[in-house]
Amino acid sequence: MLRIITGTAKGKKLKTLEGEATRPTSERIKEAVFSAIQFDIEDRRVLDLFAGSGQMGLESLSRGAASVMFIDSAREAIEIVKENAKTTGFSDKCKYLVSDYRNYIRKASGREGFDLVFIDPPYAMKSSIDAAKRLLEAGLLRAGAIVVLESGEDEIDLSELSSFEVIKSTHYGKKSFINILLYKEKEE
């Protein structure tokens, strides 16, 4: 059972999609991620790409984030996120969209950016790097944005993301690599 770890919604239980379609981030990994970014959450605009149950975005709201945009290509996932937002009392700070990440980024290009982004695609997709590059190219990352990439069994090649500084890169068990990156806007 997923739950909010700390903050204003501490202990609230979250629903998740049944079956193998989604793979929620484990509580151990979630705790490690939020421990690493704890001072970079309050009043931030958050993007939860590949939202699944929405637990990463909702945990951010519980810890003081201003708002979260949840994107998932599965309508069922977004419906679960909406239920979880209602359970935690954060519905008014949430926006939701059923969309493929590429389409969302293309359509959102040039709009107001995000301060904190969670990119956790299904492991088979191997699209963490592609999503981060597209967000950067579309101007959807604010200077100093934190990007959390979760990937499967293989470490991902971060050399394509030269505009980012690696804050933390950790392997959890046999199936999860977490990379926490800081976007450093290039000076003109």
Cite the ranges covered by each PLM segment.
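Class I S-adenosyl-L-methionine-dependent methyltransferase catalytic core
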Residues: 1-188
